[in-house]
Structures are given as structure tokens and as C-alpha cells.
Design a protein with these regions (language model features):
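Aromatic/hydrophobic pocket-lining residues that form π-stacking "cages" and hydrophobic walls in ligand
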Residues: 17, 72, 104, 155-156
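The feature captures the short pre-catalytic strand/loop hairpin that immediately precedes
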Residues: 132-133
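Dinucleotide-binding Rossmann-like beta1-alpha1 core, especially the glycine-rich loop
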Residues: 47-127, 136
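Glycine-rich FAD pyrophosphate-binding loop
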Residues: 22-44
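N-terminal Rossmann-like FAD-binding beta1-loop-alpha1 element of flavoenzymes
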Residues: 3-30
Length: 158
């Protein structure tokens, strides 16, 4: 059989690449050294869809985090898999740590993260009642989410 493109690896990147190539009438084959799709690093990742506040401004990671965070709900809907926009909190336990939160906030703003803000103790405990009582503030990133990496990779492979 003849192919236009050979994709090496059936993890999340390989399967996403093959899925995208399918939009262009290209005949793509995916080869995998493991016994099945998503048996390597992809299945063991944290499942976090990052908002983009921690990446260096101007970096590809910053761009891909922000764009991916916006694109993931629609992709998951199309693939009929769950996506949860749960947000993320970066906790601050004392005032000496607050400049770190402010630096992350500035990075996120530069990267184009929507809705990013610092929340104080009262609102933090409303957002997450089980948070440590010692937390005094947090950076809140409402555009962060989670998706099962195994389900995502398998759905893209299909």
C-alpha cells in the first residue's frame, strides 16, 4: 500500500497529526512501537489543559497553551469525549509568595489568557472549599481544564 505521509508514534501528538492530515485528502499511516495506541508517555500525562499563564511570553508553549485551551472544548465535543473546564488555582500561603502570583498574572496577561485574576482568601475558599485553610490567596485561571489523555488519543486515532 502507498501512503503520502508516515506518522511515527500513536501517542497524542501522532494521532492528532494523523487526524489533521485526514482533512487534506492525504493517505496517512501511523506506526507505533508499542502494543496499542496511547501506551507510552501520552497515557500517563496529567490530563491538564493549561491556560497558558506559566509559559514564557512569546514562546510557542504560551501560544499553544492559550490556543489549545480555547480549542479543546470544541474538539472534545466533535470527538464525543468529556472535557471539564474546571479552572486552576496556584496557591499562595504567605505574603512573601504574593510577588510570584503577580508575576504569573503578568505572564498570563501577556500571553492572552482570558479571565485570569488573583483571588483573596474568602473568594478562594468559596471557589474551592477543600483548599488548605493556610492559603491566603491564589491565581485563578478559569480557562484551564482537564481531558482524559487516553480517551482523547483513542478518539483521535479512530
Amino acid at each position: 500500500m502507498q501512503y503520502d505521509v508516515l506518522v511515527v508514534g500513536a501517542g497524542v501528538v501522532g494521532c492528532a497529526t494523523a487526524m489533521e492530515l485526514g482533512k487534506y485528502s492525504l493517505r496517512a499511516a501511523v506506526i507505533e512501537a508499542g502494543e496499542d495506541v496511547c501506551t507510552g508517555t501520552s497515557k500517563a500525562n496529567s490530563a491538564i489543559v493549561h491556560a497558558g499563564f506559566d509559559a514564557r511570553p512569546g514562546s510557542l508553549m504560551a501560544r499553544f497553551n492559550v490556543e489549545g485551551s480555547h480549542a479543546m472544548p470544541k474538539l472534545c465535543e466533535r470527538l464525543q469525549i468529556p472535557f471539564r473546564r474546571c479552572g486552576a488555582l496556584v496557591l499562595c500561603f504567605n505574603e512573601a509568595d504574593r510577588p510570584g502570583l503577580e508575576e504569573l498574572l503578568l505572564r498570563g496577561v501577556k500571553n492572552g489568557v482570558h479571565g485570569l485574576r488573583i483571588v483573596e482568601r474568602e473568594e478562594l475558599h468559596e471557589l474551592e472549599p477543600n483548599v488548605s485553610p493556610e492559603a491566603v490567596a491564589a491565581l485563578y485561571a478559569p480557562t484551564s481544564g482537564i481531558v482524559c489523555p487516553f480517551e482523547l488519543t483513542c478518539a483521535m486515532a479512530e
